[in-house]
Amino acid sequence: MSIDLRPVSRPMKRCCVFVAALCAAALFSQQSYAQRSGASDRLNENTLTVVSSSPNGTYMPIAYDMSAVLDDGDNLRILVVLGKGGGQNIKDVRFLKGVDLGIAASNTLGYYRRTGELGNIDDKIVYIAKLYNEEIHFIARPEITSIEQLRGKKVNFNFVNSGTQLSARDVFDRLGIKVEETNYGTADAFERMKTGEIAASVLAAGKPAPAISAVKAADGFHFLPVPLSKVLINDYLPTTLTHEDYPGLLAPGQTSETIAAGVALIAYNWPKNTDRYRRIAKFVDAFFPRLAEFQKTPRHPKWREANLAAVLPGWKRFEGAEEWLRTRSQVSQVSPAERGQFDQFMAAKQMQPAALPQSERDRLFQEFLQWTKARERR
């Protein structure tokens, strides 16, 4: 067979160059698309949303603190969503597809459990951690000196489906005091209180609440004392507002009794083998070991009340959070002999515990426990 060695024509050369250029462009495009696709997948896999509150509430600064401390580029990102507060936040976590986490008060969870308004939420909503106690502020006009005097008068319960609305309804119902409910934002309610249209306003928010810090005694308003009574004791805690909390409304040394409810970080109860579960578990692994960072300036002072081991009675904790706490408990109870064995275990893996993140050390300790159990069975 003979081989044709005739020179290639100039048009054919141009055609070959063009085809080669197309192939190179296609390859570059595929590589570029793969890189963009990988970055997009990584960003989506490691981003969580947390629904908070309006700027007047405490939930929003608490959620923004999570974002400020935990954001780690594409590895973990916290998107803060403005919300209406506890009641609506529970609905959003329960039903909205794009919401991973929410901040809500325990008494609003109890409200939905009692009413069945959201169906059976016992197996749908889990809590990750109790964060702090949320004070319920009762602010009244000067002629109102007791909560009983609000009977039959207009009282603002904040926005519809807010945590304040549900808390205020619950408290007045339990006390047997029937009032006329209004649903304005706190600032609007204060303006209507000045004209006498509204007698009082309620706000459930961790102290010091910005919307109330702006109020002065010169405006004619004052805190209405609401001590803890027998009808409230199962779902509320006694607390005190002080001059240090609200210098504009309370004189030095002056205090006002009120009630509070526990606030928790909640999530939907995703099955363990789902991506949404994995995402929340990753958040827990980042959040729990760094709680001490949240309890320092400039973070919200309410973080100083947080205790990861605190329970929310009657509610199930997210399994990934429960596992983390169980592991930490086991680590804290390690004997000196076991600590030496663990060090040997780490040395065998050529690892230095101090150089690893806490979540990785905890994972390795679990592996160590399994290793020791396997040795004991031999």
Where are the regions that the model predicts?
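An extracytoplasmic/periplasmic, membrane-proximal ligand-sensing/linker region
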Residues: 188, 205-219, 223, 269, ...
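Bilobed "Venus flytrap"/periplasmic-binding protein-like clamshell domains
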Residues: 45-70, 78, 134-191, 195
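Pocket-lining segment of extracytoplasmic ligand-binding domains
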Residues: 106-107, 116, 177-275
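Bacterial N-terminal signal peptides
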Residues: 16-27
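N-terminal secretory signal peptides that target proteins for export/translocation
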Residues: 1-13
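Ligand-binding clefts/hinges and TM-proximal coupling segments of bilobed small-molecule sensing domains
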Residues: 160-171, 238-313
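N-terminal (or domain-start) structured segment
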Residues: 35-103
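Pocket-flanking alpha-helical
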Residues: 67-68, 79-120, 188-192, 208-216
